[in-house]
Regions:
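S-adenosyl-L-methionine
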Residues: 6, 11-143
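Acceptor-substrate binding/catalytic loop of class I
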Residues: 121-125, 378-389, 418-435
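Conserved S-adenosyl-L-methionine
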Residues: 130, 136-210, 305-330, 337-340, ...
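Conserved phosphoryl-transfer catalytic core
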Residues: 181-251, 255-256, 363-377
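SAM-dependent nucleic-acid methyltransferase catalytic core
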Residues: 244-340, 345-351
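Conserved beta-strand signature within the Rossmann-like core of class I S-adenosyl-L-methionine
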Residues: 368, 406-412
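A short glycine-rich, Lys/Arg-flanked "PGG" loop and its adjoining helix->strand segment in the class I
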Residues: 389-404
């Protein structure tokens, strides 16, 4: 009789036959979620990607139950207590203009817990982070209330908004004046006085006429961009880098609209509506502005209802205009964590995307194009070479300001087929942008500790995969 390690083969076969059905049933009845998470933790709906499950698992291991309730990104309930993330995201999803496509409406409905909640839904921005993902990343980086997180390329301010809600101090830097302005409005909208905004909506026509008088009316459906002399909106920008009404009479606005936070809220809604009108003639510019202001008010009311009584827990945040290659932060080793996404320079021309609004704010777009990372250079190859040089400087600055042992997270997309055409080499020989950044970080003491990946939707022709790259400072 054949024997295996002293046991008859026939006996081993009988054991397998007798135990296998029971084991399979037991394994399948538990499922992956039950195997990974404690029974008292309930995941949020719509969690359906591997990277989300990974981040949720890390949250469950790194955070206490109290921290999950306060700041968790992927859990709806801890025991009998609903999490703040679930409460902020619950209810009616973000309101969209009536002419919005069914695809866009479906996106917000099926991604209610990922994006569009809090004030992230103000002013849609191409290439923006998933806010829920950023909240999860902040948690797995070990950042706690009172710490400071930096986004050196803040874009629409997702990192700053999430950090503020989590009680984590934040600093954001961007070369674009419009990004700085947009981010500040989204931050202020968490606590903006609502009564004056409601009054402005009731008197929407006078508010609209005020901005038309100040800045000019968009050329509806023309897709033409205004020049710097098209309006006078840029003159409201004062020396303190705030936006306050100066060129037109304040009496033209409803009561309370002169409050800077309220005024900026209305201004962003106007710019948002003007941008829509420039791209589409489905609605008149006024009707577009009215619909967007109504949506903005809904967003602010919804998040402030959840935050009522907890306003003191919101952390300090600073949105700055500046250069990531030479950060406006003097103190070295003063930042507890860094999160940023390099510009998708080969996928999105951010200045073309924002030129309507930048012109309204009086920005010299040609000058800005020569300064922005990813847009410098004439040919695609030259752009890529300058991009590599610039990103090395950015990582050097990140290493300078980051405390030793802390983490710098880079969220970056890549498309090797596209890069192979630019560099004129086979796709198999091309390094992805994620690999390039890991190499650039090593000489500055930034070492890879984890990399997660996710598929990108909506940018399939340019970026197919996005990586979450976690680098630790030596």
């Amino acid at each position: 009789m054949k024997r295996t390690h002293g046991r008859p083969v026939s006996l081993i076969k009988e054991e397998k036959m007798s135990y296998q059905p029971e084991n399979i049933t037991d394994i399948l009845s538990r499922g992956v979620r039950e195997s990974l998470f404690s029974k008292h933790l309930e995941l949020v709906p719509q969690l359906n990607e591997v990277y989300e499950l990974e981040l949720a698992y890390y949250e469950s291991k790194i955070l206490t139950d109290e921290e999950i309730i306060r700041n968790g990104a992927y859990f709806a309930r801890v025991g009998n207590t609903l999490t703040r993330h679930f409460l902020v995201c619950s209810g009616e999803p973000v309101r969209l203009p009536q002419h919005s496509s069914s695809r866009l409406r479906s996106f917000f409905q099926t991604n209610q817990f990922k994006t569009g909640y809090a004030t992230h839904g103000l002013f849609p921005y191409r290439g923006k982070f998933h806010p829920q993902m950023i909240k999860g990343v902040i948690n797995v980086m070990g950042l706690k209330p009172g710490d400071t997180v930096l986004d050196p390329m803040m874009g629409s301010g997702t990192v700053l908004i999430e950090a503020k809600l989590m009680g984590i101090k934040s600093v954001g830097v961007d070369a674009s004046p419009f990004c700085r302005f947009m981010t500040q409005v989204k931050l202020d909208a968490l606590t903006v006085p609502l009564t004056p905004v409601r009054e402005a909506l009731k008197n929407c026509r006078s508010v609209y006429d005020y901005f038309v008088k100040l800045a000019g009316q968009p050329n509806q459906g023309s897709k033409k961009r205004f020049g710097r002399d098209s309006g006078d909106l840029f003159s409201i920008r004062d020396s303190g880098d705030k936006y306050v009404p100066r060129s037109a009479s304040r009496v033209d606005l409803p009561w309370g609209s002169e409050i800077p936070e309220v005024y900026n809220f209305l201004l962003l809604a106007y710019l948002d509506g003007a941008g829509y009108s420039e791209r589409s003639d489905r609605k008149s510019p006024y009707d577009q502005f009215h619909a967007i202001l109504e949506r903005y008010l809904f967003v602010a009311e919804k998040v402030q209802l959840v935050l009522a009584g907890a306003e003191s827990e919101l952390a300090e945040s600073k949105a700055l205009e500046g250069d990531a290659r030479c950060l406006p932060i003097q103190d070295s080793s003063s930042i507890d964590g860094i999160i940023f996404s390099p510009p998708y320079s080969f996928a999105i021309d951010y200045l073309e995307n924002d030129s309507f609004h930048l012109n309204f704010l009086g920005t010299d777009i040609d000058r800005l194009r020569e300064e922005m990372i990813g847009l410098r250079g004439r040919t695609l190859r030259q752009k890529f070479e300058l991009y590599e040089t610039d990103m090395e400087k950015v990582l050097s600055e990140c290493a300078r300001v980051l405390r030793p042992g802390r983490i710098c997270t880079i969220v970056v997309g890549t498309n090797k087929n596209q890069l192979s055409k630019i560099l004129e080499v086979p796709p198999g020989e091309v390094k992805g942008i994620d690999e390039l950044l890991v190499e650039l970080g090593k000489p500055h003491g930034l070492n890879l500790i984890r990399k997660l990946s996710r598929q990108i939707t909506g940018m399939a022709n340019t970026m197919r995969t996005e990586f979450i790259v976690l680098l630790q400072r030596r």
